[in-house]
Design a protein with these regions (language model features):
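Catalytic cores of Mg2+-dependent Asp-rich isoprenoid enzymes
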Residues: 1-105, 111-174, 180, 185-351
């Protein structure tokens, strides 16, 4: 249906950041390009805003002289305080788009919820993007998952107010799997998100994770078994209302099923690698490249003929808890242009 990829519309890998994330964006959201144009544009807009923030923040990590995220955040806080965009501020055009979407007398309850979640997401980015980040406890870790992944999912379009809390827990689950997928990538930039109390419980050090020697510590495997067999079960349980919901918007049903399939793949490959996060990336991304064309073909076939919320493009067993149950890229000055110059911002329909 579409030769244009989602990564090409949300600024993937177009400026200095930590990783080439075009494949991550395809793994997360390639299905968006198969939606009806009017629905697709809503998703691309929100994902574009979120990816912009991710990449501005990551640019500050790789370039100590950069302040692009802080410029955007200042402009946002002005908008939040005064209800209007500060003239001449950085990223004025994007902030104006956000203001038009969520502010004003005609704003709906969903708009106000989205605004609240967007503010929560920006606060989380400001809090958790740093070289010296240390998460002390498992409870603090779950708060981080909800502040980042939960708020992210709540900003996405076509989410009903009654599904807001469920989306937060599903987003937290998503963030957990993104963190699992990116352990090596984070270690390479000196970051370990595993809470200190969990590391201490199993005799693993933060330095071992960052130096990529943790797999040599017998306690590391036990720690990962705890996180995947015990803690993950709790996250799944909290996300279960959305996983089993039968009244989601059709696009959300696809997001949910696509994501669950992705979580299954991440966990399976991680276990096949015996929790070795240094071996995981090569095997995982190779599987993603093989898997994506098949998944897209399935979306095209099933979504093209059945667009009701109760349809599923990936078969799931809803009679029990599923057994198994994250970007970021290159050139800050191009990011805003990428988001603003895409077809939906110029009044054209993408193909």
């Amino acid at each position: 249906m579409n030769s244009i990829k989602i990564s090409g519309l949300v600024g993937s890998s177009e400026y200095d950041a930590i990783a080439d994330d075009s494949l991550k964006d395809e793994d997360n959201a390639a299905w968006v390009m198969e939606l009806e144009p009017c629905v697709r544009e809503e998703w691309i807009e929100r994902i574009g805003w979120i990816r912009l923030i991710d990449r501005l923040a990551e640019n500050e990590l790789v370039d100590s002289g950069s302040s692009e995220f802080r410029k955007f955040y200042f402009g946002w806080k002005w908008l939040l305080l005064w209800g209007r965009v500060k003239p001449g501020c950085a990223y004025q055009e994007i902030l104006t788009r956000i203001a038009a979407r969520w502010f004003g007398a005609s704003s709906t309850p969903v708009d106000r919820l989205s605004l609240w979640s967007w503010n929560r997401y920006l606060k989380a980015i400001a809090c958790y993007h740093g070289h010296n980040l240390i998460v002390d406890t498992l409870a603090q870790y779950e708060t981080m998952l909800k502040d980042l992944g939960g708020a992210y999912f709540q900003v996405l379009p076509f989410l009903a107010p009654e599904q807001w809390q469920a989306a937060c827990y599903f987003g937290a689950l998503d963030q957990f799997f993104n963190n699992l997928r990116d352990i090596q990538e984070d270690a390479q930039r000196g970051i370990c998100y595993i809470p200190t109390d969990v590391l201490n419980q199993f005799g693993v050090t933060r330095e071992e994770i960052i130096q990529q020697t943790a797999c040599q510590n017998p306690g590391y495997s036990k720690m990962m078994q705890f996180l995947l067999d015990s803690y993950l079960a709790e996250l799944r349980q909290k996300a279960y209302p959305l996983i089993t919901a039968d009244d989601l918007h059709p696009s959300w049903a696809i997001l949910r099923d696509w994501s669950v399939h992705r979580y299954q793949r991440i966990e399976r490959v991680f276990r096949e690698c015996n929790f070795d996060y240094t071996q995981f990336p090569q095997q995982y991304w190779s599987e993603v490249q093989q898997d994506l064309p098949l998944l897209i073909a399935q979306v095209r076939q099933q979504y093209g003929t059945a667009r009701k919320p109760t349809n599923r493009f990936l078969k799931r067993n809803t009679t029990r808890m599923p057994v198994l149950l994250r970007t970021i890229g290159r050139k800050v000055v191009k990011v805003a242009g990428t988001v603003l110059n895409r077809p939906s911002f110029s009044g054209q329909e993408s193909s």
